[in-house]
């Protein structure tokens, strides 16, 4: 059933966002802040955000970059096993989650975790359980690139079983194995990107290489995308939208050693609307996927924002301040007509 020609999404949230720092932060922050009410901000800067002072300082830089936009940056900390209870208690009110990266698996993750020894991780993860701090995880091994996420599912299961009170967010899932894990443990949740709902590996490398679709985790097989679509379109109660929008300068993408990341922030809501309509999923499911589930899972109350979408063709700009978005130069079905503060 087609969506109305115009309709309103209430308080959209992006539960996995890269805003970078410095000039890049100032160039792209408003692309998210103008249409989302808030976002979970990734901590993998150089150096990574790993102290209370760094969290506060980075949040201040984000707030400066977004200006007067009605947008809440929900901050995260880069996980280290050395964090103790006193340290975490001191910054509990400054963060929404802590992000765990396997060492060297993605951009600026060299200081991440190696080995996943449960006993080594126990003090920090038990403290997080007690303090109700969610653990967000980039779930990939260092194995063959197409198998990395599926191989990591066993680590998710070990963590979920060892720390049953710990809320574990499987970030940007891309495989049917990760989808299946959702219902095996009550403390496993997930985010899904918009680009992984649209593309498979064929779109990235089946013809001419498409550097602006290259990301980590890499896009997978059609059957994996189908598994993602099923839980996203149904707004599975443990699944949230998280763009993993990851800007890089054009020269870092269109080069040998192409940087991993797809920039979707300016068009994420339009693409999701197009997707849900194409699959006859009701607007209520879209609303839950882009806001309701996240508010419940994270127990947050963001500032209200209303985004009015219109069924009118929109040509995606070639770039946003030097960053090339997904589908640059192509026409998509929906335009954002108006954004206003909600009631």
Which residue stretches match the model-derived regions?
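Active-site neighborhoods of metal-dependent hydrolases
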Residues: 192-259, 307-340
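Short, electropositive alpha-helical surface patch
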Residues: 73, 92, 147-165, 183-194, ...
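Short beta->alpha connector loops
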Residues: 21-24, 79-83, 172-176
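His/Asp/Glu-enriched, well-ordered alpha-helical/loop segment
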Residues: 234-301
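Histidine-centered catalytic micro-motifs
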Residues: 10-22, 135-141, 192, 245
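Histidine/acidic residue-rich metal-binding segments in metalloenzymes
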Residues: 3-4, 87-100, 108-241
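Divalent metal-dependent hydrolysis catalytic cores, especially in the metallo-beta-lactamase
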Residues: 14-15, 27-54, 67-80, 96-108, ...
């Amino acid at each position: 059933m087609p969506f109305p020609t115009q309709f309103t999404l209430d308080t959209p949230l992006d539960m996995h966002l890269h805003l970078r720092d410095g000039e890049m932060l100032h160039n792209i922050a408003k692309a998210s802040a103008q249409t989302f009410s808030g976002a979970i901000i990734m901590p993998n800067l150089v150096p990574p955000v790993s102290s209370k002072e760094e969290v506060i300082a980075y949040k201040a830089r984000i707030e400066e970059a977004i200006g007067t936009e009605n947008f809440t940056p929900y901050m995260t900390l880069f996980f280290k096993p050395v964090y103790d209870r006193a340290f975490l208690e001191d910054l509990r009110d400054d963060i929404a989650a802590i992000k765990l990266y396997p060492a060297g698996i993605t951009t600026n993750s060299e200081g991440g975790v190696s080995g996943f020894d449960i006993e080594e991780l126990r003090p920090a993860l038990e403290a997080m359980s007690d303090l109700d701090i969610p653990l967000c995880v980039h779930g990939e091994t260092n194995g063959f690139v197409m198998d990395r996420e599926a191989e990591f599912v066993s680590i998710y299961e070990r963590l979920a079983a060892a720390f049953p009170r710990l809320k574990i967010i499987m970030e940007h899932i891309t495989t049917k194995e990760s989808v299946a894990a959702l219902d095996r443990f009550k403390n496993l949740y997930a985010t899904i990107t918009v680009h992984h709902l649209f593309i498979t590996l064929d779109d990235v490398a089946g013809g001419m290489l498409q550097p602006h679709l290259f990301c980590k985790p890499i896009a997978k097989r059609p059957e994996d995308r189908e598994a993602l679509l099923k839980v996203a379109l149904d707004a599975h109660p443990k699944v949230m939208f998280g763009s993993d929008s990851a800007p890089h300068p054009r020269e870092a993408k269109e080069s040998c050693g192409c940087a991993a990341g797809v920039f979707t922030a300016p068009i994420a809501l339009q693409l999701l609307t197009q997707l849900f309509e194409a699959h006859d999923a009701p607007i209520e499911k879209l609303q839950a996927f882009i806001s309701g589930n996240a508010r419940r899972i994270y127990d947050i109350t963001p500032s209200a924002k209303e985004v009015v979408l219109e069924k009118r063709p929109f040509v995606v700009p070639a770039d946003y301040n030097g960053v090339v978005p997904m589908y640059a130069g192509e026409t998509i079905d929906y335009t954002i007509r108006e954004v206003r503060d909600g009631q």
